[in-house]
Regions:
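PLP-dependent amino-acid enzyme catalytic core
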Residues: 2-420
Length: 420
């Protein structure tokens, strides 16, 4: 689907190693352009590459951000010269206390709470902004369940662009405030995320200067999630984990982490050892988990009802590709209740000092379920993606945590509280 015939095409673009857009269904290729649907079969497009001269040494000598992987991304060769939020290279935490608690001997947490707006969405938005600039757009826009709204508003402010963000009006107050503070235009829509996404798709076809990061520049945007896979492999000493658990909203993150692992193996940057990919959903929005359990390839849309609003996408665009990925690698997709999500948030905070938003709670709670079912190997090297900060979803733990005691200004009362 074309957004505008006036925007740049591949004959004049510098998008690094990217050479074309390829249909994930029929394989048809088109030149690089602001397109997201195949003109032949209407399947989704993704970026195809010709990689040249990518080495570990070149990567390790690069910036301490996702731009160290610029030679593996659809971004201009001079990407670091333009203002951006420079996310990435977040910490990979060895989680022995949590691992002992849940029964995993070799557990790591990829902690993306340390990104500029405290979620992994800074990665995908940084790549989308770099591509959008090269494609000739001038406004950065998105429909969002919250984290993407924060990232788009911040990246646009940093770049000096206008932002237009559409959100469901039921979004957590913290995420609304964390978007509005950057300026730009923030519009709350009376509907759920899927309603907001449909509205954004209509606007993307009408507003030729607007880069809707997860609509008309989605093929480029989605590639930003590969940097999670690249970083995990590099931080493990240039090797792949044996198991990785990824939260599933649209499903793009999971499929792109898998793509990253495969690219690293093909390029000889890591030994292409086997790995299993697992997906995590909340029961109140679990269309992919349901399809996996039923053994079908059909992901039926649902109406979300969960505290994990950042995962509340009832009609996930990459749902079928998530199923393909987990089945190909020997993984699985499962789901957990909201109560289990809250328990997992508290467990992670108590054992490792990381306060995750609800998506992280979903990931950890699903990990426990996968261990109990025997689907996760307790002895294998395992990575969990913690994709956002709990400060964004304080309402999830409200009523579950608070002061141990309330006392007067008396040391005796403090001591009684300590003993109680």
């Amino acid at each position: 689907m074309s957004v505008s015939t006036t925007l740049s095409t591949s004959t004049s673009l510098d998008l690094g190693p990217a050479r074309a857009l390829s249909c994930r269904e029929c394989g048809h290729e088109i030149p690089l352009a602001p397109e997201f649907a195949c003109p032949e079969c209407f399947g989704p497009l993704e970026v195809a590459y010709d990689f040249v001269g990518v080495t570990r040494e070149r990567i390790e000598a690069g910036p301490k951000s996702i731009w160290r992987y610029a030679s593996l991304l659809p971004v201009p060769s001079d990407v670091t010269r333009h203002p951006n939020t420079e996310p990435g290279l977040t910490r990979l935490v060895r989680a022995d206390r949590l691992g002992k608690e849940i029964g995993l001997k070799n557990l790591w947490l990829k902690d993306d709470t340390g990104n500029p707006t405290h979620s992994f969405k800074d990665r995908v938005v940084a790549v989308a902004l770099a591509a959008a600039r090269e494609l000739g757009f001038s406004v950065l826009a998105c429909p969002s369940t919250g984290n993407l709204a924060n990232a788009v508003a911040a990246a646009a402010a940093r770049a000096g662009w206008r932002s237009v963000v559409l959100i469901p009006k039921s979004l957590e107050l913290a995420k609304i405030q964390m978007t509005a503070v950057y300026g730009g235009t923030l519009i709350a829509v009376d509907g759920n995320y899927d309603d907001v996404n449909r509205l954004a798709t209509e606007l993307a076809a009408e507003e030729e200067d607007w880069a809707f990061v997860n609509v008309n520049v989605r093929p480029y945007y989605a590639e930003g999630s590969k940097t999670l896979g690249f970083e995990v492999a590099e931080q493990l000493g240039w090797r792949l984990p044996e198991q990785i658990v990824v939260p599933v909203a649209s499903g793009s993150q999971l499929t792109k982490v898998d793509k990253a692992f495969r690219e690293l193996g093909t390029l000889g940057l890591v030994e292409p050892t086997p790995y299993k990919v697992f997906g995590a959903q909340a029961t109140g929005c679990s269309p992919v988990s349901t399809a996996f359990a039923e053994g079908t390839d059909v992901v039926r849309p649902v109406r979300p009802d969960t505290i994990a609003r950042s995962l509340a996408i009832g009609n996930p665009a990459d749902g079928p590709y998530v199923l393909d990925t987990v089945r190909r690698t020997g993984g699985a997709v499962t789901d957990v209740s909201d109560a289990e999500v809250v328990d997992a948030i508290r467990l992670l905070a108590r054992t490792e000092g990381i306060f995750a938003e609800t998506a992280g709670g979903v990931t950890l709670a699903c990990t426990r379920k996968l261990i109990e079912s025997g689907q996760l190997d307790p002895d294998a090297d395992t990575v969990l993606l913690i994709t956002g900060d709990g400060l964004k979803t304080l309402d999830a733990v409200a009523g579950h945590v608070g002061p141990t005691a309330t006392v007067s200004t008396s040391t005796a009362e403090v001591r009684r509280a300590l003993q109680g």
